[in-house]
Amino acid sequence: DISQWPVHKNSAAIVASIGNDKPLRYNTDMSYVFVPPGQKKIDVALVEYPDESDKGPYPVPENVPIEGWPAWFTRDADQKLTLEDVQRDKANQGGDRHAIVVDPFAGKLYEFYQLKRTDQASGGRKAPETRWQCACAAIFDLNSNKLRPDGWTSTDAAGLPIYPAVIRYDEFKAGR
């Protein structure tokens, strides 16, 4: 609980510049995963925006969290969904299904829109080597401010990464 922590000395000016009367929505359940050096890279089928996706392979680990995991998917005790159930969209909830993978050793950020674990490639072809699919995949160089090509989408639909906007507890604690 951070509600009793002191606010930034310029908090009032920051809030005023954004607009004190405007609604603020934030995701409390945007999970991400850091991968170790040498994380195996795999193919992910690009099923909706292949021409605006960065080509793989990608370092997607078996435990990659899907947006909402675990908070959203474990709130209902009757549901009893596992991470793999969520990855496969067993409950047919659909949605944005963002997934964020950070490779700090290679300085790369991988973001996926509608990531889904599957045993089939698009079009119903059996493809055991294709275990994941997504609508869009974006790779960002963490050592650069380079943007995606003009007009390209990304996992946030604006060509920008999501991860820089994720607020982490350790950042709050450090006062950043």
Task: For every predicted segment, state its role.
Residues 1-176:
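Short, surface-exposed polybasic-aromatic patches that bind anionic ligands, especially phosphate groups
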